Amino acid sequence: MTVRTRFAPSPTGLLHIGNARAALFNFLYARHHGGKFLLRIEDTDRERSTQQAVDVLFDGLAWMGITPDEEPVFQSTRQARHAEIAHHLLAQGLAYRCYCTPEELQQMRDQAAAEGRPPRYNGYWRDRDPSEAPAGAPYTVRIRAPREGETVIHDLVQGDVRVANAELDDMIILRGDGTPVYQLAVVVDDHDMDITHVIRGDDHLTNTFRQAMIYRAMGWDLPAFAHLPLIHGPDGAKLSKRHGAQSVVEFREMGYLPEALNNYLLRLGWGHGDAEILSRDEQIQLFDLDGVGRSASRMDYVKLQHLNGVWLRQADDARLTDDIVARLADRPDVSVDEAVRARILALMPGLKERAKTLVDLADSAAFLGRHVPLAFDAKAEKLLTPEARAMLGELARDLAVIEPFDAPAIDVALRRFAEHHGHKLGQVAQPLRAAMTGGATSPGIDATLAALGRDEVMARIGAVAR
C-alpha cells in the first residue's frame, strides 16, 4: 500500500498554526513512509472562500516547505460527483428524501429539548412513502443511520473511540438546493483521491462517526484516522489573539524562520527522545504517529523564540542579509545600497549571535545604513562625554593609517592606543561603539569598524570628535 495523506483546509482566512501543524504532520508522515502528500482546498463556502485566501494559504505552505506531490484539488469543482453519490445512496434505499420544513424541524428540536433528549431530527420521513409529501415540496436527502450496535473508530492517536449508533441521527447529505454537505464531500473526495490516512485535529473526531456511515453505506474501505490534540495558549485556554500570534503570516512578519516554526510545531505534541533541533531530513526520518500524544499542547512563545535564535545562528549569512535588506528598505532613516548590503553581509556572523528574530537582526543592523550625523540613544549620549570625544579625535589619527583596515589590524591598533594612553580597552571601545552605531551594543568593535570601512569610520568619528 502506498501511503497517501492530505491537508484539506477551508480558505476563509489566514493559515492558523494548528492547521499548519496538521499540514506538517501529514507531509512528514507521507515522506517517512515513501508515500504522497496531497492538498485539497475545501472552498464550497463561496462567500467566505476567496482567491486571496487561497493565495495566502499556498504562500504559507510554500514558505514552510510543505509542497504537495500532485496538483491541488478544489472541492467546489466536484459537486456533481458528490451529488452523484447522494443519488446512488437514494436509489439503493440507503438514503431517503426528507420533506420537513424548517418550522417542523424546529418543533422536533424544541420537543426533544423539553423531554431532555438531544435536539435532533426524529426520522419522520425515514419510512414514509414519498407520495405522502405535498406535490412539488422541496426536500433534502438524508442517509439512513444504523440504529443498533455501535460504531468504533480505531484511531492511531486516540485509540479506539466508540459511539452507540442510537446516538447518530439521519444526517442530511444533500441540501434542498441540491448542494452536498461537508460530511459527504469529504468522504467522496478522500475516497476518490485514494487517501489512506486522514490526519487532522481532534475537533473533527465526532465528524468521523458520521463520515463512517457514508463509507460503509457505499461499501468503501475506511482510511486510517489519526486525530491530533489541539494547540492551546500558555494558560491552557483555547489559543486566541490575546495570547499572541496565531497564524503563519504573523510569525513570518515577526521575523521567525520557517525552519524554526516547523521544528517547534513538530515538537509541539510529538516527541522523540531529547532531540530538540531537527533538520527536515531528520524530521522525515524520525516522524511517525506513535510519538504523538493525546493531550492538548500549550503554545510556548519563549521556547519558539529560543529555537528561532538557534536556527538564525545556523542560517546562511547571504540569505539572512537578503531578508534584512528587504526589511530595512521600508525604514525612512536607513538607506540600503550595495555598499550597505556588503557591510551587513560582512558583519552578519556577529549580528546573528545576539538576535532572536529577523526583526531583532534588522534592528541591530540598521546602524550600518544610517547617515552621519547619527542620532544617539541615551546610553550612547552618556558614553560620549567631552573627554571621550577628544579621545576619539586622537584615535582617528591611528585608525587613518592602519593597513590593511581589517578586524585583526584594528584590534591591534585599539589595544595599542588604549595601553599608550593608560586606558582599559573598554574605555576606548565603548565610546567608539557609540560613535559608530548610535547605541551601546554591537558585534565586536574590531569587526564593526572593518565592516563599515575606513572612510565611513572616519566620517562617524569626525561627527563627534572634538
UniProtKB/Swiss-Prot annotation:
Entry keyword set: Aminoacyl-tRNA synthetase, ATP-binding, Cytoplasm, Ligase, Nucleotide-binding, Protein biosynthesis
Gene coding for it: gltX1
Originating organism: Gluconacetobacter diazotrophicus (strain ATCC 49037 / DSM 5601 / CCUG 37298 / CIP 103539 / LMG 7603 / PAl5)
UniProt GO MF annotations: ATP binding; glutamate-tRNA ligase activity; tRNA binding; zinc ion binding
Protein name: Glutamate--tRNA ligase 1
CDD domains from the UniProt entry: GluRS_core
PROSITE patterns linked to this entry: AA_TRNA_LIGASE_I (PS00178)
Taxonomic classification: Bacteria, Pseudomonadati, Pseudomonadota, Alphaproteobacteria, Acetobacterales
Function: Catalyzes the attachment of glutamate to tRNA(Glu) in a two-step reaction: glutamate is first activated by ATP to form Glu-AMP and then transferred to the acceptor end of tRNA(Glu).
InterPro entries for the chain: aa-tRNA-synth_I_cd-bd, aa-tRNA-synth_I_codon-bd_sub2, aa-tRNA-synth_I_CS, aa_tRNA-synth_I_cd-bd_sf, Glu-tRNA-ligase_bac/mito, Glu/Gln-tRNA-synth, Glu/Gln-tRNA-synth_Ib_cat-dom, GluQ/Sye
Enzyme type, top EC level: ligase
Pfam families per the UniProt record, alphabetical: Anticodon_2, tRNA-synt_1c
Any GO BP: glutamyl-tRNA aminoacylation
Subcellular location: Cytoplasm
Motif ('KMSKS' region): 238-242
Catalytic reaction equation(s): tRNA(Glu) + L-glutamate + ATP = L-glutamyl-tRNA(Glu) + AMP + diphosphate
Annotated EC: 6.1.1.17
A single Gene Ontology CC term: cytosol
